């Protein structure tokens, strides 16, 4: 469970920003997106392979320049 301590002397906006940052670090937003619908294991592997190829192409371009 994620919790943020709210200080009475600080504005609410700062506490809200800290909460959003903590949620981002914990990966809550990404996990919710992943759980919205089921993805088959084969589809996960295909996506991972596509991303690896894309990263390799980008690294090759950067190394070439």
Curated annotation (Swiss-Prot):
Q: Which GO terms describe its biological process?
A: translation
Question: Which InterPro entries does this entry report, sorted A to Z?
Answer: Ribosomal_bS21, Ribosomal_bS21_sf
Annotated GO MF terms: structural constituent of ribosome
Annotated keywords: Ribonucleoprotein, Ribosomal protein
Listed disulfide bonds for this chain? none
* Keyword Ribonucleoprotein listed: yes
Tell me the Gene3D superfamilies matching this sequence: Ribosomal protein S8 (1.20.5.1150)
**Pfam families cross-referenced by the UniProt entry:** Ribosomal_S21 (PF01165)
- Specify the domain of life of the species encoding this protein: Bacteria
Report the GO terms under cellular component: ribonucleoprotein complex; ribosome
Similarity comment text for this entry: Belongs to the bacterial ribosomal protein bS21 family.
The record's listing under HAMAP family reads: Ribosomal_bS21
Provide the protein name.
Small ribosomal subunit protein bS21A
Organism (species): Francisella tularensis subsp. holarctica (strain LVS)
